[in-house]
Regions:
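Active-site neighborhoods and metal-handling regions in enzymes and metal-associated proteins
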Residues: 1-157
Length: 157
């Protein structure tokens, strides 16, 4: 059952989302050659806490860090560690924040330095398909329509 949120609840949800968005911006600024994903985790965690948020991944089912990081072909939801980022890496970061009983979660793909044309094409296709899917969302729209929008664009590009 979907419960409508009050204007106050929506404002709190927006605030949680803003903390996530700004956390991802910070991660993107920090992520560069020779930086470890553990360092990114530490800085993002400090930022979240300063904003009054709670990094919700930390401790969830034993997860030891505040953000999820995956480099290149690593499976999503990787644990930040001491590996230094290298030129050409593709870094995926997932951030989840609890704020006043609500949760926001988002992910971002960050190219490190110069990446291959193929990698950039894949990143671009994924981002474009996201915006097409958002545009396709309408009240009472079936999820399959949105999923098809994503699939068709990615397969064609």
């Amino acid at each position: 059952m979907i419960v409508r949120k009050s204007p106050r609840e929506i404002e709190i949800m927006k605030a949680a989302g803003k903390i996530v968005a700004n956390s991802l911006r910070l991660a993107k600024e920090i992520a560069s050659k020779d930086v470890t994903t553990d360092y990114i985790n530490t800085e993002v965690e400090k930022f979240i806490v300063r904003q009054g948020g709670i990094p919700i991944f930390k401790g969830y089912r034993g997860f030891p860090k505040s953000i999820c990081t995956s480099i290149n072909e690593e499976v999503v939801h990787g644990i930040p560690g001491q590996r230094k980022l290298r030129n050409g890496d593709i870094l995926s970061i997932d951030v989840g924040v609890g704020y006043r009983k609500y949760v926001a979660d988002a992910a971002l793909t960050i190219p490190i330095g110069e990446i291959t044309a193929e990698a950039q094409r894949l990143i671009d296709a994924c981002e474009k398909s996201l915006w097409l899917a958002i545009k396709a969302i309408k009240s009472n729209e079936m999820l399959s329509i949105i999923s098809r929008t994503i699939q068709e664009y990615v397969e064609d590009n």
